[in-house]
Amino acid sequence: MNALTAVKANTDDLAQRHTGFTLAPSAQSPRLLALTFTADTTRQFLHQVAQWPVQALEYKSFLRFKIGKILDDLCGNQLQPLLIKTLLNRAQGALLISAEGIDDVAQAEEMVKLATAVAHLIGRSNYDAMSGQYYARFVVKNVDNSDSYLRQPHRVMELHNDGTYVEEVTDYVLMMKIDEQNMEGGNSLLLHLDDWEHLESFFTHPLARRVMRWAAPPSKNVSHDVWHPVFDVDQQGRPVMRYIDQFVQPKDFEEGVWLSELSDALETSQNILSVPVPVGKFLLINNLFWLHGRDRFTPHPDLRRELMRQRGYFAYAASHYQTHQ
């Protein structure tokens, strides 16, 4: 483990009696906390937000914050500060969130509402060019002919950060399981940057801070390239990453070889977490120091998984990129 942040469970938060939800370390790592809304909180939340269909949240962005306030009020106003504290805590920065009673694809709209409420307690979800909304829903099937690895089921989707090919700051990523049929495998893969064995050697390499070109395929609906280095630092000088192997465009032999070595070093890390995410649950991670990916699925002709993602910026004190410092 890197010396940057040793894992120290926040015993005060874990021992505290919370209103409307429970909190515990996940089975995979003390860095990843499991937060579960009680059945009563879930029922009251869905009742109070039933008047607004998801379309209303799409058209009136302030409603996303309103339903966040409803959820926080139901949790005795303990939820928002805990979410912010956890996600900004370098030693943690990740949550697996669920709500008792939300676990079926027939509740897809309710899932979007819940995830939206949580996300807008910490910041605001960015426009997603792939879907044209503040969130994107997409399906993984047994056969895929798309132009990126996002929907390809029979290979590992390598570890990466989101927001590498857009101008907007991407502080957080939310990934929710809406449906799953005939599925085996396909766990979410997570790696905390400070647990990566090779962080120091790559972060101190001369190419770590070189500005590189990033370009997305047509399905992303982004027509222009962006330029930034693989590594930056946060306000305390700690490493953060903006990296995805599919979209970085090395300009020469030196960059290409270094990027290939970086990819191999990430994928062979012994500290990658494999996290099952059942239907109705979602991961919420700090995108600056967590990388995420997906394990391969076992082939099945009727394989189907539907996911929903949101990604955006923290509206509170955050360690944004300090480019070229």
UniProtKB/Swiss-Prot annotation:
Q: Which CDD domains match?
A: CAS_like
UniProt keywords, alphabetically: Dioxygenase, Iron, Metal-binding, Oxidoreductase
| Cysteines engaged in disulfide bonds, as pairs | none
**Pfam family of the protein (one):** CsiD
Cofactor comment text: Binds 1 Fe(2+) ion per subunit.
Whether rRNA-binding counts among this entry's keywords is no
Superkingdom is Bacteria
* Cited InterPro entries: GlaH (IPR015038), TauD-like_sf (IPR042098)
What cofactor does its activity depend on?
A: Fe(2+)
According to UniProt, this protein's pathway is: Amino-acid degradation
Going by the record, the broad EC class of this enzyme is oxidoreductase
E.C. numbers: 1.14.11.64
Tell me a GO biological process for this protein: L-lysine catabolic process
GO molecular function ontology, one term from the record: ferrous iron binding
- Which portions of this protein are annotated as coiled-coil regions? none
Sorted alphabetically, which HAMAP family does this protein's record hold?
glutarate_hydroxylase
Task: Write out the similarity annotation.
Answer: Belongs to the glutarate hydroxylase family.
Q: How does it assemble?
A: Homotetramer.
Biological function = Acts as an alpha-ketoglutarate-dependent dioxygenase catalyzing hydroxylation of glutarate (GA) to L-2-hydroxyglutarate (L2HG). Functions in a L-lysine degradation pathway that proceeds via cadaverine, glutarate and L-2-hydroxyglutarate.
Protein name per UniProt:
Glutarate 2-hydroxylase
